[in-house]
């Protein structure tokens, strides 16, 4: 198996320090002892993440550290042996970092969806703590990042076993469910040698639902849980059809939905109700009416008129008229 070069863990420590500044990030250059500072706004973070090559699921809100905060190891570091955890440029060892610092490192790489560096990071952990390094650390944040490293390195069986047998906190459910489903897609695509279409992905989701360890069992339809839909409907009927921004924030806290999702749901619901009410209030068209637009039902319809009885009735009338004529002839006065 090919050895992975050691990682510049001092740069990771810079990453740990910078995640506490939500509005400005400082970039540290490893080639110069002086620190050059430049800032970037959070609006540019998503652009930097888009080059990570990860699956197209949404970034969560743990630590938003741009991938550029974590520089590529210098040639001197890359040429070092993996057997020595000491970083020549800084003289630091991975074992000197606290659990909190390693959690910040792994979480930052996970948020950047930087699969290559995550794989190298966990290889270095294994060199220090052995093949069961993740179990040795007993940190859920590190294990969550480890699942993405398994996904990135195509270790599907290990990934599925880990996700199916370890219970995770609910705040990680969305990320882990996305990893589970994308791993199923990727595994199938590698076996078939072709891209999956939406129908095939849907069948895989139905065949391999997320395990209960990362799913509360509630069905999600169009990104809305059933309980969230019920909450929105009750609010719409009992509270207001036009919630304020503060009410939307309260709904967001109660349901876990985003403000934009809540706004769109209320807008669509108002439009549906308006369309339904318009359809109920509009008069029926004359073409669709069975009685020509009259408010009264016809006494005799063409379907109820018995044509077979018509000749019989006409004969009776004709016979009566003929008898009347013969009676008149009998009482004719001849002068």
Swiss-Prot record:
Span list, region Disordered: 27-56, 269-294
Phenotype reported upon loss of the gene: RNAi-mediated knockdown results in 60% larval lethality. Surviving animals display uncoordinated locomotion, withered tail morphology, and defects in both CAN neuronal cell migration and axon guidance.
One Pfam family linked to the record: SIX1_SD
Biased composition (Low complexity): 28-41, 276-294
A Gene Ontology BP annotation from the UniProt entry: regulation of cell migration
Location of the protein in the cell: Nucleus
InterPro entries per UniProt: HD, Homeobox_CS, Homeodomain-like_sf, SIX1_SD
Polar residues bias locations: 42-53
Residues in the DNA-binding region annotation: 225-277
SMART domains recorded: HOX
Keyword Isomerase part of the UniProt annotation: no
Entry GO CC: nucleus; transcription regulator complex
Keywords for this protein: Developmental protein, DNA-binding, Homeobox, Nucleus, Transcription, Transcription regulation
Gene Ontology molecular function, alphabetical: DNA-binding transcription factor activity, RNA polymerase II-specific; RNA polymerase II cis-regulatory region sequence-specific DNA binding
Role according to the record: Probable transcription factor required for differentiation and migration of neuronal cells, such as RID and CAN neurons. Specifically, plays a role in the terminal differentiation of RID peptidergic neurons. Also required for CAN neuron axon guidance.
Family: Belongs to the SIX/Sine oculis homeobox family.
Full protein name: Homeobox protein unc-39
Organism classification: Eukaryota, Metazoa, Ecdysozoa, Nematoda, Chromadorea
